[in-house]
């Protein structure tokens, strides 16, 4: 099986706006084409045309057991009403986690304003995904997105599981340290490139990921994700193939880690992980 733990249904990167139904159909098509068994859809930190709310995505995907939702949180507008909405979604088991976007918004993860979000994550035992590293938007402020800032909330909220998105790119070693040091911190490999990997960049990223595992980061703390549609599913599967990891590590990264962290109960798509593993 293969789980893509990091996808979006936003289409702000396209010149033409699409409906949520169209974007969802496109995601399903890509999943079938590339034999992806399940995906987590991360909603945005703001609700505008092209960026549907968590509840809208939950309703649109309610009939699709292989697509689950992670609710994006806006630091700028986070208030009691948002806490109530998140609680409602969590009580209904409609979302599998929360997502913060430091860098896209000017805040640090340890901002006390976000304490209610972390307490919700602790109460319902769902992970908090945190954007780190480079921002797709040129007006982002990357000082807020350094992976070292995740260490503070990981220490202050030891019963909450945190996921550092994008390996902290370009601060890979800092990401390694935070994941290695904190039992409750994980990372994903999503969003390392836009579109396709170039040969030189793919070789560089392979080295970074292998170094992370050799450095002491347990493979059961690294999750497979793409950041689709900004990144190519096909390119990412090729990247995984070129890593040439041991079969056990591949299985952990491609499926088992995400299934455990997000508590996913899924039926495998025929020809998913087994087919991919057969390529190596």
Descriptions of predicted regions:
Residues 1-8, 19-38, 217-223, 232-280:
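Mid-to-C-terminal alpha-helical segments outside catalytic/metal-binding sites
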Residues 6, 31, 57, 98, ...:
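Conserved, mostly hydrophobic/aromatic
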Residues 6-12, 131, 166:
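Histidine-centered divalent metal-coordination motifs
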Residues 9-22, 135-137, 196-198:
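Acidic/histidine-rich helix-loop elements
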Residues 25-48, 66-74, 96-97, 162:
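Divalent metal-dependent hydrolysis catalytic cores, especially in the metallo-beta-lactamase
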Residues 45-46, 75, 102-104, 134-136, ...:
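Active-site-proximal loop/turn and secondary-structure-junction residues that shape catalytic pockets
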Residues 48-144:
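Active-site gating/metal-coordination segments in enzymes
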